[in-house]
Amino acid sequence: MWRWSRGSSTSTSRTRVRCAWGKFNEMSPILAARGASLNLKGKIYKVCVQSVLIYGSETWPMKVDDLHRLERAERMMVRWMCGVSLKAHRLTEDLYKSLGVESVFEVVRRRRLRWFGHVERKNKDAWVSACRYIQVEGVKPRGRGKKTWGECVAEDMRSHGLRNEDAQDRVVWKSCISGKRLTRASMEKWT
């Protein structure tokens, strides 16, 4: 299923959006119902639709366009569940809070960091670790290359203030990426 054309995950993100809309339409009697509580809609959305939308995304070398495609689809679904049109001028963040749903950007980032932690703690002889450092033979084309998965992870780690060494301690790593934003000082007391 994960067939990337020349290192791009564009077709994969399009497929995920299409599958998520299919699942959303399947669940629309509940998700679009006026009588159902927003909290219930949010829980059903997270389990049935958002999980389909971001399936496997922790392994994608995600470009900005791919992320925007996922975010755009999710925002449309969130507005539909809340019964709010764009003309109402309600902030999407407020709608996320009322549903109890985290944005797809944060979920993808956390899942990618969680996967990185698993890979980083693996034995260096494991095939997963070996795949990270494969050198492809051939001539490199001119210009900047495509964004790699490692670059995506590096961005995520910079935004959370993390280092590669932090991934070795599973408890600290899990608490850092779970939403409990630990500062460097509070991490020091754990070690």
Regions found by a protein language model. Name each.
Residues M1-T191:
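Short linear motifs embedded in intrinsically disordered, charge-biased segments
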